[in-house]
Amino acid sequence: MVKKRLPSNDTVFRFETPGSPRKANVEASRSSTDSPSSVFFSSEAENGVEEKKKACRSPTAQSPTPSVEAESPDQKKIISLRSKSSFDGASLASDKNDCKTESKNDPKTERKKSSSSSQYKANMHFHKLFLSVPTEEPLKQSFTCALQKEILYQGKLFVSENWICFHSKVFGKDTKISIPAFSVTLIKKTKTALLVPNALIIATVTDRYIFVSLLSRDSTYKLLKSVCGHLENTSVGNSPNPSSAENSFRADRPSSLPLDFNDEFSDLDGVVQQRRQDMEGYSSSGSQTPESENSRDFHVTESQTVLNVSKGEAKPTRADAHVNRVPEGKAKSLPAQGLSETVGILHKVKSQKCPMLHHILIFYAIVVCALIISTFYMRYRINTLEEQLGLLTSIVDTHNTEQAAPSGLGSQVQFNVEVLCQELTANIVKLEKIQNNLQKLLENGD
């Protein structure tokens, strides 16, 4: 079957090759599906169909077979080249598929390697900066943030199992803060911007730090809470629920009380409701500053003390049970009460400064009003003086115009007066000489 098929295909090549040798080269570069070499590797059924088609052709196409058989070695070389090209194409396709699968797997491995390498570098940098942290303690996570002081110190917050550290380098100044996790007494969310909640407060017994510009505040807060497991889940002032003292007060109060006690407790309820409204107003406001939160904590502690005192006076029989409860709450929140006391002192100092500020502002307002009135008065006086000067200049002008006509006569009269004065002086001199001569004569006669 192969021997019969070769001449017929060779005839086709013979008619194409002598006319245009370039076409043979183009056909040699085609794929295996378009080249005649694919016919040689086809099934016997396809070969039978092709033989029938070739038998139907004209005898002129089959007549030059002897000459083609003479050229069969060249055609065999072409066929071998085509088979090689088809094999090379198949190998290239398989290589491309392998490259695609490798390229799909490469990004995942690269990401894992890059994340592990970045974590390793961050851990090394963390232990290099903070030598007090043991090298066996790995870094959990680092966050970019800024420490709020007189200016913002941009840096990084490092969190490990037992340490919370911050490092910043601004204007060549290194700022390092190391906070042991067990010494943290308060972790609170706060706002320094109007719209973006981006700040956290970390407080100890002695210090208080505000970290702002946190891109993922919630994740940072959760990680810090997990590290500081000794803290309570809710911070003071963040929950809108009533305080523990108020809850205990409402739980211990019986349903039926005398009329006098009802009046007293109604007053206390009004105070508590007012405090609660203040707390809700602070929590519903768009921006919360640390000062407002501090004042809110002070109000809560103040309301608790008022409730405790009033309850001790109204119900002496249950005072012992209530006193037993209060120290437990105080034992749990001793650092928070220490902070609230300091905040209360600051609040008192600020309240004392407020009247002085009011008096100074009133004094400055009075001075400004006096200056405004004096400026108006000076302006009025200047206008009146300008009017008077205008009148005087007009009078002088009219007087000059009136005296302009007899100016010639006046000059003549003045000239005559001067002449008369000169003559009179000359006569007086002569009279004096005569008098002197007469006196001399009289003296000589005597």
Swiss-Prot record:
One of its GO terms (cellular component) is cytoplasmic microtubule. The modification Phosphoserine is found at S239, S256, S266. Keywords: Acetylation, Phosphoprotein. Residues 95-113 have a biased composition (Basic and acidic residues). It comes from Pongo abelii. Pfam families: GRAM. SMART domains: GRAM (SM00568). This is GRAM domain-containing protein 2B. Residues 124-191 form the GRAM domain. The modification N-acetylmethionine is found at M1. The gene is GRAMD2B. Residues 29-43 have a biased composition (Low complexity). Residues 234-247, 282-292 have a biased composition (Polar residues). Residues 1-120, 234-253, 276-298 are annotated as: Disordered. Signal peptide: none annotated.
